[in-house]
Amino acid sequence: MSLVLDPAAQDLLFREARTANTFTDEPVTDEQVQAIYDLVKYGPTAFNQSPLRITLVRSPEARERLVAHMAEGNRPKTAAAPLVAILSADNEFHEELPELFPHFPAAKDAFFSERPVREGAATLNAALQAAYFIVGVRAAGLAAGPMTGLDFEGVRKEFLDDDHTPLMVVNIGRPGPDAWFPRSPRLAYDQVVTTV
């Protein structure tokens, strides 16, 4: 069975897409990032939650501060990438639910009045949105390098509001020389899918 999406687009988004470890110097513009967001904001979440927050690290001073919080192996590529984004979850996302989920505005108080519940929902749904963001970067013809090797608390204190939880840092740009490690294997269908 074939998929509806054109095979070239499937390759761009998944089969040929790789996590880049080196990048060219070509800038990533605000217009490109906005086009990516304007596409991926339509990805589904529970209750149409939109807890993902994206902090673009552009200035040399901010980049230096971020690199200090990255794991040693992630520092050179984070310093060299044309653009770096900190993806975080806004734990006060529920304040926007009356606007984003208008057919049930009471969802804000009915389901998310307790902080632990809110934090769990924010992390789960922002992680979904982060995955859409990575695919959106690929759809723009760019490479993404998502990383979780970092001092999360240090990044939160340095860059984020108190109510935001950092999820990952993503390097973004055109892949440079020797950008890829060898492709790692993936689990086969039968290892993942069961029928009951």
Curated annotation (Swiss-Prot):
Domain of life: Bacteria
The enzyme's E.C. designation: 1.-.-.-
GO MF annotations in UniProt: oxidoreductase activity
Gene3D superfamilies linked to this entry: NADH Oxidase (3.40.109.10)
Keywords: Flavoprotein, FMN, NAD, NADP, Oxidoreductase
Swiss-Prot/TrEMBL cofactor(s): FMN
InterPro entries: Nitroreductase, Nitroreductase-like, Nitroreductase_HadB/RutE, RutE-like
SUPFAM superfamilies: FMN-dependent nitroreductase-like
Family in the record: Belongs to the nitroreductase family. HadB/RutE subfamily.
Protein name: Putative NADH dehydrogenase/NAD(P)H nitroreductase SCO5049
Organism: Streptomyces coelicolor (strain ATCC BAA-471 / A3(2) / M145)
